[in-house]
Amino acid sequence: MARIAGVNIPTNKRVLIALQYIHGIGQKNAAEIIEKVKIPVDRRVNQLSDAEVLQIREVIDRDYLVEGDLRRETGMNIKRLMDLGCYRGLRHRRGLPVRGQRTHTNARTRKGPAKAIAGKKK
């Protein structure tokens, strides 16, 4: 099993698919990495040489923000919004949808389970 960016990559999958197991690398970025390293698209991870794995590691470290660094930067961006006190920051702070979705009836995922309210009794 190859280990790239702190993630164990599955050995029997194609390199294009296996790279997507790394947080921050999707289909487009995986294709770009393969193109930069000049690996055939149909090559599987267990067929890669150590030199090719090293090249992939170097390209990812040099050109892409992945795993812990990406998570940290995303968290810092959200924290910055909350510290500014802007509308998006307030929505994050209150645990409500940030991108303008309605909250009167929906948004249960973001708001959490429904809270019981003492209403009309029969």
UniProtKB/Swiss-Prot annotation:
Annotated TM spans: none
Any Gene Ontology CC annotation: small ribosomal subunit
GO MF assignments: rRNA binding; structural constituent of ribosome; tRNA binding
UniProt xrefs under PROSITE patterns: RIBOSOMAL_S13_1, RIBOSOMAL_S13_2
GO BP terms in the entry: translation
Top-level taxonomic group: Bacteria
Chain positions covered by the region annotation Disordered: 99-122
Keyword rRNA-binding applies: yes
Protein purpose: Located at the top of the head of the 30S subunit, it contacts several helices of the 16S rRNA. In the 70S ribosome it contacts the 23S rRNA (bridge B1a) and protein L5 of the 50S subunit (bridge B1b), connecting the 2 subunits; these bridges are implicated in subunit movement. Contacts the tRNAs in the A and P-sites.
UniProt subunit comment: Part of the 30S ribosomal subunit. Forms a loose heterodimer with protein S19. Forms two bridges to the 50S subunit in the 70S ribosome.
Protein family according to the UniProt entry: Belongs to the universal ribosomal protein uS13 family.
Record protein name field: Small ribosomal subunit protein uS13
Organism of this sequence: Rhodopseudomonas palustris (strain HaA2)
Name of the encoding gene: rpsM
